[in-house]
């Protein structure tokens, strides 16, 4: 990135926000790092005031309500954070001629497919989380013509709730029950952060799927986490309805990074 460009990362204390910060902090860019305590993205005036005062060249929205169960329990809060927040940031980006980067999810698909979803497949979310994130995508497209939307899946790394839960149970030697009928692509937060930065720098505006390589079930993912931990803890495959560590998600939400391949990124 060019010297003195300003990058505003909203949700800077989250998994992806932290990794982006680590990757950019020793570069010539000026980082503007906020979380809800500094700027509440659901407050349109606070967002406009901060953007107007700091005039970022990029606004990266890593903030969001990502707890799927919590979204189901509080629909209004989910849409307020994931949709209205994205709208507020998009409006600020348009007003300041900044480029808007929106992080989204595989949950925008219904899981009924049997082949990986591309950027050209029609979303049909079944959860409040997925619906609120899709609404956020639509607001970004409506209010800011200079935008990149990044969909990813099963993001793991420092602070990952599922990863941490499995590691904790493995450390305690407790039997782990994991869904064998939920399949997607685990994606490292570091890998995702690197690709987002690359897209910010050189990619045309639009929608991109960005995931790791190779799909697996929650059960297989848990098995690999336990293996890496060195634990001998038993991992038992169960149906998603019996998996207490994760909320209901699409049964199949493997993303195909088609636009990355076609764009040579």
What feature does the model see in each segment?
Residues 80, 84-88, 108-150, 155:
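Catalytic helix-loop patch of NAD(P)-dependent Rossmann-fold dehydrogenases
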Residues 73-101:
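NAD(P)-cofactor binding segment of oxidoreductase domains
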Residues 44-81:
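NAD(P)H-binding glycine-rich loop region in Rossmannoid oxidoreductase-like domains
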Residues 25, 31-49:
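Adenosine-cofactor binding site in Rossmann-like domains, unifying the SAM/SAH pocket
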Residues 138-184, 189-191, 197:
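NAD(P)-dependent short-chain dehydrogenase/reductase
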Residues 195-196, 202-247, 251:
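Mid/C-terminal beta-alpha module of Rossmann-like enzyme folds, strongest
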Residues 251-265:
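C-terminal amphipathic/interface module of NAD(P)-dependent oxidoreductases
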